[in-house]
A protein has these predicted regions:
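Conserved mixed alpha/beta core segments that line enzyme active sites in large multi-domain catalysts
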Residues: 16-44, 209, 226-284
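Phosphate-backbone binding interfaces of nucleic-acid-interacting proteins
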Residues: 1-169, 173
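Hydrophobic alpha-helical scaffolding
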Residues: 44, 76, 93, 135-142, ...
Length: 284
């Protein structure tokens, strides 16, 4: 399936608020908005608390469409004609991973160099497409970008270009970390690498965006890298903080009946022996 990221949005453009006047007795502001070729003096009312004169934002004009099939029509608000709607990031289907600042309370505040009348898809990165490919359970080898590329190369009889790698192997991890596998029927092999001198922090925007488009939420640079590589080559990975591992040990085993685990998104799950867990010296 080919998904048009901005396909549900129509007639939403960059608008510059040239005038912003409070409407007496209401929480609204009556704005004059420059939308380039669509009109330089369009009157739109908004209740957003962060609106200001000079703001560049997303203007949904009369007859426009927003995600979810929402139709915008010119109509009076508190007795004053409003010829559209000024939009928040959420109303455009955005979050901070897709476009920084999208989750701010109020209107989407765009850079001052954005040109009035420009389709909003071009400004916030929604002028793009996603290939959504359904993979059957017996083709786990295709559940990655590399896997799909390998399949396409085979079908078209073309050479496969492998991802570039550049790394140096130092001492073996055995000297720092003990790894053992009890449930070999579920996990025939488990490999660990020890990486030093890492500073946890926020991932770059391009990586957060790529993960979001694949349905994953950005957590930190370390976690995001493991997820990004998993999507690229199909190898599931997890990063552990060595300082938090009890006894510097990793054990792969079946879960105990009723054992509980809390995931990175703070959700708790109750496990059964049919579940596989990765533990440190004492717990999953």
């Amino acid at each position: 399936e080919l998904i048009d990221l901005g396909g549900e949005i129509s007639k939403v453009v960059v608008g510059v608020v040239t005038e912003c006047v409070p409407q007496e007795g209401t929480h609204l502001h009556i704005c004059k908005v420059d939308c380039g070729e669509y009109g330089h003096d369009i009157q739109i009312s908004t209740g957003a608390p962060n609106v200001y004169a000079g703001m560049h934002t997303a203007a949904a004009l009369d007859g426009s469409t927003l995600p979810g099939g929402v139709k915008i029509k010119a109509k009076p608000l508190m007795g004053v004609e409003s010829n559209g709607m000024l939009c928040s990031g959420e109303e455009l289907g955005l979050n901070d991973d897709l476009y920084p600042g999208a989750e701010v309370y109020g209107l989407l505040d765009l850079p001052k160099d954005t040109v009035p009348g420009t389709p909003i898809q071009q400004v916030v990165g929604l002028d793009d497409y996603i290939f959504d490919i359904s993979i059957t359970a017996n083709r786990a080898d295709c559940q990655s970008v590399l896997g799909i590329a390998r399949e396409v190369a085979a079908v078209l009889n073309k050479p496969l270009k492998m991802p570039a790698t550049d790394y140096t192997v130092s001492d073996y991890v055995d000297s720092r970390l003990s790894i053992s596998v009890e449930a070999e029927d579920l996990c025939p092999r488990y490999i660990g690498h020890y990486v030093r001198n890492i500073t946890p922090g926020e991932s770059p925007r391009w990586m957060r965006r790529q993960l979001a488009l694949c349905g994953l939420r950005s957590i930190s640079n370390v976690v995001d890298i493991t997820n990004y590589v998993m999507l690229e080559i199909g190898q599931p990975m997890h990063a552990f903080d060595m300082d938090a591992l009890e006894s510097c040990q990793i054990l792969v085993r079946r879960a105990k009946d009723g054992e509980k685990i809390t995931t990175l998104d703070e959700k708790e799950f109750t496990l059964t022996p049919n579940n596989l867990v990765i533990c440190d010296g004492s717990k999953p």
